[in-house]
């Protein structure tokens, strides 16, 4: 059984003739039901006329005759108006119900009496907590709305209890009754309005109209489904005549749909590899979906292009036999002949440029105009960024730094063996000689500097940072794999040559200075090696030696006879 909600009553109070302000009070009928019911009936006036007083049992028109500042405001004497009258709905006085509730704060309502079991109609509202009244007066309610009105009532109070301005109850009642009455009035007004507007015939007409509207909506939905299914799942046959007719119909459909100036509806298509002309369309999209379909989808379009490039050429040859146009027009006609409705910029760019590399990012061309179309996608710089940490690939480096020799034989400096005066420039110069300069100019200076700086970052960081670089194994053991690697990219210059190139083009770092050995620690070189290697020093280098020359015998793993060999390893 659900618990019954406590009733709420209201008092419309006017202080000193001011406009009416409302106080809403909750009655604790769950704790003191008899006392709460007495107050509720006195607010509504439903009990009629009192037996002893002969006056209506109603608070309406009565006043708060006693208001003491900081204590309470007392009222409810509807018969005399001075605290000597009043009557309960039970006739005369009634006994104290219980004292379970305390006078614990402002806004608490309690019954006024002249001793035990003398409860009538008079009550008081506390302005603050009054614990000394507990056990003497029965608490039955509390103010839930209008505490500002209670504070205003306190302002007109005095110490003797006579208010400076009259505080009168203009109206009172139960809030649930008012809400129910208002709801009933609203329902009555609605029913009158509906009876005025709609007769029984009008109601039937309206129902018939709604039925017709529903049927027409269903028909329209069916038509849409039929049209979209027939349009989206139509597939072309394998014959050339069918593909040509469908290409014509698709182009006419697109022109008609775009003639009204609205957005053209795109359809993303997918080609199956097994059958030549078969396509499945994803169906019509609404106006809101037309814009996202315009955006090039990299995944779907790349799959479509890679699987349908050969089929497009087969089907397109028949459509453009009689027309002689350039390559761009041929590819445009090829698009129309295979009824491609996905006209993303990626598809047009791929067919116009006919690049066979799957990488779609811009490829950085480093000074070489005639690149082979069969570039490996691994060696293309796919993202085209110019980050200083990006490694140039072997093939691009080889293309840019290769220079033709006078005899047509590629210039390769081997590992210190077979030196002649022809290759002495590699030991004499910091930078390449004019005959070894690149044949083509760089696109910009920053590009050249970035390439020089980042040409071999792994080798540079290893030789400069790691202390294990001084203890490398002899070049004779590592020559077969290194030789094979140089056979693939013939443009790599020797390690010592690159180190001199870096030292000449950059400022001298303290790291190189700390590594360079003094002349007295240098090991003596045999006369045979001196004649083969030529002059080892240049005034420009400032007396610095390469790390391979400055190895001490205790650290060098090579035998004493080969101690002075220079290693030109990559």
From Swiss-Prot:
UniProt cross-references to Pfam families, sorted A to Z: Pro_isomerase (PF00160)
EC number(s) given by UniProt: 5.2.1.8
Biased composition (Basic residues): 262-292, 340-351, 468-490, 509-523
Chief subcellular location: nucleus
One GO CC annotation: nuclear speck
Regions of compositional bias (Basic and acidic residues) in chain numbering: 203-219, 323-339, 387-397, 437-467, 495-505
Highest taxon in the source lineage: Eukaryota
Region annotation (Disordered) ranges: 180-570
InterPro entries (alphabetical): Cyclophilin-like_dom_sf (IPR029000), Cyclophilin-type_PPIase_CS (IPR020892), Cyclophilin-type_PPIase_dom (IPR002130)
UniProt xrefs under Gene3D superfamilies: Cyclophilin-like
Keywords for the protein's UniProt record, in alphabetical order: Isomerase, Nucleus, Phosphoprotein, Rotamase
One example GO MF annotation: peptidyl-prolyl cis-trans isomerase activity
Bias (Low complexity) ranges: 229-238, 246-259, 297-309, 352-365, 546-555
Residues where Phosphoserine is found: 340
Function: PPIases accelerate the folding of proteins. It catalyzes the cis-trans isomerization of proline imidic peptide bonds in oligopeptides. May be implicated in the folding, transport, and assembly of proteins. Probably involved in early steps of spliceosomal assembly.
Similarity comment: family membership: Belongs to the cyclophilin-type PPIase family.
Quaternary context: Interacts with SNRNP35, RNU1, SCL28, SCL30, SR30 and SR34. The binding to SR34 is phosphorylation-dependent.
UniProt protein name: Peptidyl-prolyl cis-trans isomerase CYP63
Gene name tied to this protein: CYP63
